[in-house]
Amino acid sequence: MLTPEKISDLVSDAVASIPYPAEPARLYQPIAYTLESGGKRLRPMLAVATCSALGGEVSKVIDAATGIEVYHNFTLLHDDVMDRADLRRGQLTVHKRWDDNTAILSGDAMLTLATMMIAKAPAEVMPEVLDLFNKTAMEIYEGQQMDMDFENRNDVTVKEYMEMIRLKTSVLLGCACRTGAIIAGASQQTAQAFYDYGVNLGLAFQLRDDWLDTYGDPLVFGKQIGGDIINGKKTWLLINAMTELRQELCDILAEDLDDEERVSQVRAVYDRLKLDERCHSLIADYARRAVSAIDAVELDDDARQYFTSLAVKSIDRTH
């Protein structure tokens, strides 16, 4: 299997090498701006790593892997418009630097570009890869709609929330892994095992994001701590607190408090309920499920270590 450094370099080079026409600049500059802003590149690395681990030719997966990354960033462009977010990865969001219409149209172009790149998968598997991508994209839109619907509800259950983050976040990681497996020529059973790995890893990552938003170090996390509380965002932490201490939490959220005091009081409720430790335990559980999903797959030691390490890092990552 390729080394982690080689996988990272391949993905970074592929994203940096996407050719953009010079005109119209207002369409393409925001795309370059978004893709040059960094990010973990987790999804394309999963596609490349899975293909490599299963003995596939990495050159055959790199276009699809890059397309998945372009698609992921398209969803962020539109999410930022819907959420009215000002910052993404420490810089102005596209709709703030340009305007809403630019963010929408550049996002549309990214969706088409992503589909074109994914369609470059080897001809013998291209229909399967494209079907998987389209199914995944529809699930992501369903998850985003659920997230928006939750904004107007105070009775969201943990089960509903977990289904929402599975759709909105996790299935794209599963798609990336399965795409790599398909292009490597793996069996359906192996492809499904890696899909399950990606979905469980995605759940661990999203739950850790929830945790970091409340308990992280702002200098390391790169975002304002307590943003989810301030914005009334439904997270695993808030939903559990609402289930157990609804009236007290509703009183705090309704009270005329400054942001710092509101975050402090809500976090105190979380602490009393030991939601910090309970969330951490659940993250570790999903990380274990990810590793267990590929237990039966024949992998060399380096490959198994790569995927195990990714899962373990999801438990205690700081950003």
Regions found by a protein language model. Give the residues of each.
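Hydrophobic, well-ordered secondary-structure elements that form the walls
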Residues: L238, A290, F307
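Amphipathic alpha-helices that form helix-helix packing interfaces
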Residues: V11-A14, A204, A290-A293, L310, ...
